[in-house]
Amino acid sequence: PLLKIFQEVGAADKIEWVSLDEAYRLITLDENEKCDYIMPLGKDAFISKLEEYDPGSSAVVSKVFDLIESIEKTLDFVSNIQDFKPSMIKEIFSEHTDFLKVANYSVDEVLKSMGASQKTRDILNGYWCYLGQPTDELNVIHYFTMLHSYIIDGAVIPRGRSHQISTALLEAFTENGGEAWFNTSVKRIIVKNGVATGVELEDGTQINAKAVICNASPYNAFTKLIDEKEIPEKLKKEVNAKTLSAKGFAVFLGLNRSADEL
């Protein structure tokens, strides 16, 4: 789906993708249980490597991947529905029962119910930080879908990392007549009669538009960018009903020492 978006906006040929051999590496510094696990891509290779780290795990992990593939088939079925018919409900309940059984449970609940050991769960859950929630809260459908995308479909990264994606999108945008302003803060979104009609910049400049796209979180958009009186009560309730997920931050630290010295 992401590649399709790049193709649609004319940025696909501006990004060079590099295939990865490894899924991820897990390292802990716990004095009681230090670990260093390097997991490969590919279903069979992943199962075999996990068996090395946790002998006896392959049977359970194979069942986990069977469930992952079953969930993916259900999602493909639903996403390809063009003209919904009542008969499809029967098909969902008869042929997609795996999805229905686990859809309302967390990753931990499902893995524990399948008999996965603590070590197997720890290794399988290596991608949890990508979705920002701990696995006792993270929905199993969301996580297993990501495991399918990476472990089974394969993983790639842009040669220039995420910055190459940003520059490619910018180039495609400007080539199609767009104009990008950097270091330009928006003070508020202008709303008239329930419709966003433009934005006001920090310096007071107003820019009118037929549509406004805001990539700030709903909370920030509704509390900092839009006048409260312009926000429908329904949207206020939706935002207030949400709970915050786990948060993290990345530190890029340059050290003036060689790896051997450190």
Regions found by a protein language model. Give the residues of each.
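Short beta-strand to alpha-helix junction loop
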Residues: 96-109, 149-171, 181-183
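Glycine-rich loop(s) and the adjacent beta-strand/alpha-helix scaffold that form part
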Residues: 158-176, 189-190, 200-262
